[in-house]
């Protein structure tokens, strides 16, 4: 019963915190409207391309922090409960994508998802993040590297849940599948641009 009360408190709070769009805030500080420059997406990649590397990296760190903070709440308040970490992490991702402060239009949820998985699966996160940066450095296609990292994290968590079968593991599996599907859905415009050979490139170190 106590856990239920915690869920009722932290899920809405996670959504509200997730709804804070740091790309929009930082771009405004720089006298720019991130939704009307570059790809129009208020997220890390567009910030890197359109506002600057430093500001893009700052956006990434702050967006990650949203997922990290609520996954940590899931870990410590709910005592390493996998379901709680998934639920609270996903609540921040939903806030980021469907921001209540921006008419339910936000970013694509990658950085916030990575932050959550950094707490849930730190070793796998380190591998996935390294591969993502490597892919971006060599091939300059940010969204493919991002999706690759998310796929690695979600699939390894699916496998882990299937093997360990903790309490409510089947709910965890459903959440993970929905999480992955949601991230792919937010990148539907990128897939269209790839198909039309108009996807933007990004030189991370150039």
Name every feature range the model reports, one short phrase each.
Residues 5-29:
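N-terminal signal-anchor transmembrane alpha helix
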Residues 6, 55-61, 65-100, 132, ...:
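Nucleotide and nucleotide-moiety/phosphate-recognizing core
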Residues 23, 95-105, 131-139, 187-192:
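C-terminal ends of transmembrane helices
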Residues 24-55, 188, 192-206:
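Cytosolic, membrane-interface loops and tails of multi-pass inner-membrane proteins
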Residues 33-43, 101-114, 141-152:
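Short, non-helical or kinked segments that cap or interrupt transmembrane helices
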Residues 48-51, 74-77, 109-139, 151-161:
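Interfacial segments of multi-pass membrane proteins
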Residues 126, 142-150, 166-178:
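Loop-to-transmembrane alpha-helix initiation sites
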């Amino acid at each position: 019963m106590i856990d239920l009360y915690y869920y009722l408190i932290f899920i809405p709070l996670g959504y509200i915190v997730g709804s804070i769009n740091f790309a929009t805030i930082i771009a405004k500080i720089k006298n720019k409207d991130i939704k009307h420059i570059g790809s129009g997406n208020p997220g890390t990649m567009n910030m890197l391309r359109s506002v600057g590397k430093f500001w893009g990296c700052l956006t990434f760190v702050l967006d990650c922090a949203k997922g990290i903070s609520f996954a940590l709440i899931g870990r410590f308040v709910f005592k390493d409960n996998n379901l709680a970490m998934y639920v609270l992490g996903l609540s921040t991702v939903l806030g980021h994508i469907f921001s209540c402060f921006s008419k339910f239009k936000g970013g694509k949820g990658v950085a916030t998802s990575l932050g959550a998985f950094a707490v849930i699966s730190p070793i796998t996160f380190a591998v996935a993040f390294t591969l993502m940066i490597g892919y971006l450095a060599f091939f300059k296609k940010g969204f493919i590297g991002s999706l690759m990292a998310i796929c690695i994290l979600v699939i390894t968590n699916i496998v882990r849940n299937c093997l360990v079968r903790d309490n409510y593991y089947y709910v965890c599996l459903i959440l993970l599948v929905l999480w992955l599907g949601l991230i792919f859905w937010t990148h539907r415009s990128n897939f269209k641009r790839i198909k039309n050979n108009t996807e933007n490139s990004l030189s991370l170190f150039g």
